[in-house]
Amino acid sequence: MNRINQLFNSNKKDILSIYFCAGNPTLDGTVNVIRTLEKHGVSMIEVGIPFSDPMADGIVIQNAATQALRNGMSLKILFEQLRNIRQEVSIPLVFMGYLNPIMQFGFENFCRKCVECGIDGVIIPDLPFRDYQDHYRIIAERYGIKVIMLITPETSEERVREIDAHTDGFIYMVSSAATTGAQQDFNEQKRAYFKKIEDMNLRNPLMVGFGISNKATFQAACEHASGAIIGSRFVTLLEEEKDPEKAILKLKDALK
């Protein structure tokens, strides 16, 4: 069974997933960040593939991607860095990246390399669901790679149900149609959206992302989903502290 399915089948509550951009702040720090996050109780990790035009991301992750590319990070190097990662960590690892670099690498080759490294899934924010269905699903399923789809407050109920019926792993529930970035709290409109999706009783578990940065936002997300994904806040702390251990301890402190 895929590690993503194992995690959610365990009925674990308040799942914490952390995003960071591979190659930032240093080119060779990827494995150490992953190792450190697992050590400190993170349940799942999203490894960002840097891209020059990350349209769904706010300024923090845009800057991290720019720095990672300047440092020389590429998909080829990332796969080389992660080739023995399963000797060190056992939690689910998910790539998050845009379609362009993945297509340049070749989608089937990308899936093959994911299997070799023990990557469990991929989130591609700019991959339309229809394109996934028509062109990529058969390849991803052949290799056992979960393609995680995003939904937003603007996603129709019909499309949400369609995504739920034709994907596996979890559904990434974006807290707003805006870009990524830390928020202090969620307003009533966002909370109502979370509840509406929760009340649809979908087949797939839900994870909330975009804007999670503190106890209030983390708890609000976990109230209506299996857990939450934190990206921008951890990326900021990682750059400030220059040490993944200090960064994750500071973040976990903010979630208490």
Curated annotation (Swiss-Prot):
EC identifiers of the protein: 4.2.1.20
GO cellular component terms, semicolon-separated: cytosol
UniProt cross-references to CDD domains, sorted A to Z: Tryptophan_synthase_alpha
UniProtKB keywords: Amino-acid biosynthesis, Aromatic amino acid biosynthesis, Lyase, Tryptophan biosynthesis
SUPFAM superfamilies xrefs: Ribulose-phoshate binding barrel
Key word Lyase present: yes
Catalytic site positions: E46, D57
GO biological-process terms attached to the record: L-tryptophan biosynthetic process
Pfam families with a match to the protein in the record: Trp_syntA
Subunit structure: Tetramer of two alpha and two beta chains.
Family statement drawn from the similarity comment of this UniProt entry: Belongs to the TrpA family.
Protein function: The alpha subunit is responsible for the aldol cleavage of indoleglycerol phosphate to indole and glyceraldehyde 3-phosphate.
Protein name, entry field: Tryptophan synthase alpha chain
Source organism of the structure: Bacteroides thetaiotaomicron (strain ATCC 29148 / DSM 2079 / JCM 5827 / CCUG 10774 / NCTC 10582 / VPI-5482 / E50)
